[in-house]
Regions:
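Non-transmembrane "mature" sequence context
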Residues: 1-91
Length: 91
């Protein structure tokens, strides 16, 4: 079940996998701003989706309960749901 959120230290380890993709490009700065400066989530989304990141965060995702990833950012439960989904995605 998607609601089974991983411990925070596991999420932090997952974020580290994508840090090398983050170079503070203009595209990445815009993505980060769109995600309310949630750098961890931005790094993972960019690491997985690269130039499709902006389109993806605005897309309705069935796995998230038919909401957009961008709508999960400021809600604790939805943010955990998004993080869990991201850990199940691959590059």
């Amino acid at each position: 079940m998607l609601e089974e959120y991983y411990e925070n230290n596991l999420w932090e380890d997952y974020v580290k996998l994508y840090e090398s993709f983050w170079i503070d490009s203009e595209y990445q700065k815009i993505l980060l701003n769109s995600l309310n400066n949630k750098i961890d989530i931005a790094k993972v989304i960019y690491g997985i989706l690269e130039k499709d990141s902006h389109r993806w965060i605005e897309k309705i995702i069935p796995t998230l309960g038919n909401i957009r990833p961008i709508d999960c950012i400021d809600d604790e439960i939805l943010s955990k749901r998004l993080k869990t989904m991201l850990t199940r995605m691959s590059r």
